[in-house]
């Protein structure tokens, strides 16, 4: 059973969002899944601590970061937007399905919204499992499913001021554009 909890820290929210009703964190204590959408920098140490278990033989942590160029174009930043109620539901299902499929001990998925500067993380994924094989496979699978299914969109903002909106699924694991 998942629960959605609005967090109370004063995020840098766009003015049309009410921080008291904006659902940013969903947890399932039974399956040890934790989903967060935030305008704050992501905390990998916190992600690992949420899934830490004495039964774990492996913890895998992935951080997706904003790099300074894409296809020889200098990037200024990435900007993310989402439909939070549906994105939280989708990300929760991805995490819960991964726990069942890979016999995981826990999953954290955190995604930044708003502007993400060069060098900062836009996504954190942490998985915990009894053995490394399951953890490695699950971590990559969770990432690819997040990019494929989550209702989160990014705008690549280039140094020249131009930008391109993209669904995360527009690129493959090597970062190449997927032709529709």
From Swiss-Prot:
Record's keyword terms, sorted: Cytoplasm, Molybdenum cofactor biosynthesis, Transferase
UniProt GO molecular function: molybdopterin synthase activity
Pathway(s) annotated for this protein in UniProt: Cofactor biosynthesis; molybdopterin biosynthesis
Segments for region (Disordered): 1-31
CDD domains per record: MoaE
Gene Ontology terms describing biological process: Mo-molybdopterin cofactor biosynthetic process
SUPFAM superfamilies in the record: Molybdopterin synthase subunit MoaE
GO CC terms: molybdopterin synthase complex
Compartments in which it is found: Cytoplasm
Keyword Thylakoid: no
UniProt main location, coarse: cytoplasm
Polar residues: bias regions: 1-10
Assigned EC number: 2.8.1.12
Pfam families per UniProt: MoaE
Binding sites annotated in the UniProt record for substrate: 131-132, 147, 154-156
Reactions listed under catalytic activity: 2 [molybdopterin-synthase sulfur-carrier protein]-C-terminal-Gly-aminoethanethioate + cyclic pyranopterin phosphate + H2O = molybdopterin + 2 [molybdopterin-synthase sulfur-carrier protein]-C-terminal Gly-Gly + 2 H(+)
Membership in a protein family: Belongs to the MoaE family. MOCS2B subfamily.
Quaternary structure and interacting proteins, as annotated: Heterotetramer; composed of 2 small (MOCS2A) and 2 large (MOCS2B) subunits.
Family matches, as HAMAP family: MOC2B
Name under which the protein is recorded: Molybdopterin synthase catalytic subunit
Organism annotation: Aspergillus niger (strain ATCC MYA-4892 / CBS 513.88 / FGSC A1513)
């Amino acid at each position: 059973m998942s629960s959605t909890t609005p967090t109370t820290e004063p995020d840098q929210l766009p003015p049309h969002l009410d921080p008291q009703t904006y659902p940013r964190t969903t947890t399932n204590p039974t399956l040890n899944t934790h989903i967060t959408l935030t305008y704050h920098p992501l905390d990998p140490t916190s992600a690992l601590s949420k899934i830490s278990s004495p039964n774990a033989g492996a913890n895998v942590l992935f951080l997706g970061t904003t790099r300074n160029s894409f296809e020889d174009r200098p990037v200024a930043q990435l900007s993310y937007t989402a439909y939070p109620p549906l994105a939280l539901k989708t990300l929760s299902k991805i995490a819960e399905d991964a726990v069942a499929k890979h016999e995981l001990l826990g999953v954290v998925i955190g995604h930044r919204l708003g502007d993400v500067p060069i060098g900062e993380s836009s996504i954190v994924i942490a998985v915990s499992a009894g053995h490394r094989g399951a953890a490695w496979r699950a971590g990559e699978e969770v990432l690819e499913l997040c990019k494929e299914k989550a209702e989160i969109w990014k705008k690549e903002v280039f140094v020249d001021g131009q930008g391109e909106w993209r669904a995360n699924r527009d690129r493959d694991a090597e970062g190449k554009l997927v032709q529709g």
